[in-house]
Amino acid sequence: MIRINYFNENDINMDFWKKFCNKILKTAYNYFNFNYDIELSITFVNDLKAQQINQQYRNHSYIADVTSFPVEMTENEIKAIGFRELGDMFINLNEAKRKAIKYNHDLNSEMGFLFVHGFLHLLGYDHEDSNDEKIMFDLQDQILKLNNLEYIIKFNEDDYLESN
């Protein structure tokens, strides 16, 4: 079973996105066929908070769309508490909307991508080198396709400049 604790630091009702995320991440949980329950937290944040988190913890000043902080646990710790705590994910709906428009994605695909991308980071996947990137992005594609979503990654370096 997957348990998701939601926190909303926006003035926007996020109930739709919570339900959408539950569906997406339940598919991801089933895809990996975990032999234990997992738990994670997702906080919906505004631009200022997303930028502050990115600056404080990653030393980048741009406004992030998703930021993940994994928790590492041993098998003994998982057995002791009965589930695996994955960590915390911060999602910025405003930045997701901007990128959906900029890259001509629908917002469901953009948000689905962010939920899966952040989830994979919580599991320890990364895209720092080309081999790891291929593995992570292939997993993203497979999980999104299971949810009838398609997401074509379009990278624009301007999105990650420090002056944003």
Curated annotation (Swiss-Prot):
Keywords per UniProt: Cytoplasm, Endonuclease, Hydrolase, Metal-binding, Nuclease, Ribosome biogenesis, rRNA processing, Zinc
Main localization (coarse): cytoplasm
PROSITE patterns given in the database record: UPF0054
Keyword field contains Metal-binding: yes
Binding site for Zn(2+): 117, 121, 127
Gene Ontology, cellular component aspect: cytoplasm
Compartment list: Cytoplasm
GO BP: rRNA processing
Requisite cofactors: Zn(2+)
E.C. code: 3.1.-.-
InterPro entries assigned: MetalPrtase_cat_dom_sf_prd, YbeY, YbeY_CS
Gene3D superfamilies named among the record's database cross-references: Metalloproteases ('zincins'), catalytic domain
Enzyme class: hydrolase
GO MF entry, a single one: metalloendopeptidase activity
Cofactor binding, note field: Binds 1 zinc ion.
HAMAP family: Endoribonucl_YbeY
Family: Belongs to the endoribonuclease YbeY family.
Function: Single strand-specific metallo-endoribonuclease involved in late-stage 70S ribosome quality control and in maturation of the 3' terminus of the 16S rRNA.
Name this protein carries in UniProt: Endoribonuclease YbeY
The organism of origin for this protein: Mycoplasma mycoides subsp. mycoides SC (strain CCUG 32753 / NCTC 10114 / PG1)
